[in-house]
Amino acid sequence: MAEENHDEAVRVAELRKKRTFRTFAYRGVELEQLLDLSAEQLVDLFHARARRRMLRGLGPNASRFIRKLRKAKSEAPLNEKPATVKTHLRNMIILPEMVGSVVGIYNGKLFNQVEIRPEMIGHYLGEFSITYKPTKHGRPGIGATHSSRFIPLK
């Protein structure tokens, strides 16, 4: 009896060790299948704004950017991250073939390095490079209110 409980406990522990990772799916389509889709089929999966942008065409700058990403990926050693490709194209829609690339997205001052993950498909590059410095609200300054005048200054 004790031996059966021990065997079952070992089996349960092994099942816990073997973690199953959730595979990413964009709108019900897995990443491997997304890479195989044609442009027309991929456009049908995007939200309306991205679908309109793709149907009107990405333009020469976006095409040049994708070529640079492909080149960086092909030149990268096996199991290594590709070289960073810098861009000002904040309005570029993230496509499935961009997954795994490292992109330097310009925020108006510097290039923020972002590794493209599957969860980012369909979003814009600019969403991942904030253009402003969030405010850190501290103490009120002089002239804020009458009561704040009595707060000692540092």
UniProtKB/Swiss-Prot annotation:
GO BP annotation list: cytoplasmic translation; ribosomal small subunit assembly
Keyword Phosphoprotein: yes
Predominant subcellular localization, coarse grouping: cytoplasm
Cell compartments where the protein resides: Cytoplasm; Nucleus; Nucleus, Nucleolus
GO MF: RNA binding; structural constituent of ribosome
InterPro entries: Ribosomal_uS19, Ribosomal_uS19_CS, Ribosomal_uS19_euk/arc, Ribosomal_uS19_SF
Positions where Phosphoserine occurs in the chain: 63
Database matches in Pfam families: Ribosomal_S19
Gene Ontology cellular component terms for the protein in this record: cytosolic small ribosomal subunit; nucleolus; nucleus
UniProt keyword annotations, A-Z: Cytoplasm, Nucleus, Phosphoprotein, Ribonucleoprotein, Ribosomal protein
Family the UniProt entry places it in: Belongs to the universal ribosomal protein uS19 family.
Alphabetical list of PANTHER family matching this protein: RIBOSOMAL PROTEIN S19P FAMILY MEMBER, SMALL RIBOSOMAL SUBUNIT PROTEIN US19
Function of the molecule: Component of the ribosome, a large ribonucleoprotein complex responsible for the synthesis of proteins in the cell. The small ribosomal subunit (SSU) binds messenger RNAs (mRNAs) and translates the encoded message by selecting cognate aminoacyl-transfer RNA (tRNA) molecules. The large subunit (LSU) contains the ribosomal catalytic site termed the peptidyl transferase center (PTC), which catalyzes the formation of peptide bonds, thereby polymerizing the amino acids delivered by tRNAs into a polypeptide chain.
Complex and partners: Component of the small ribosomal subunit (SSU). Mature yeast ribosomes consist of a small (40S) and a large (60S) subunit. The 40S small subunit contains 1 molecule of ribosomal RNA (18S rRNA) and at least 33 different proteins. The large 60S subunit contains 3 rRNA molecules (25S, 5.8S and 5S rRNA) and at least 46 different proteins.
Record's miscellaneous remark: There are 2 genes for uS19 in S.pombe.
The protein's name: Small ribosomal subunit protein uS19B
Gene: rps1502
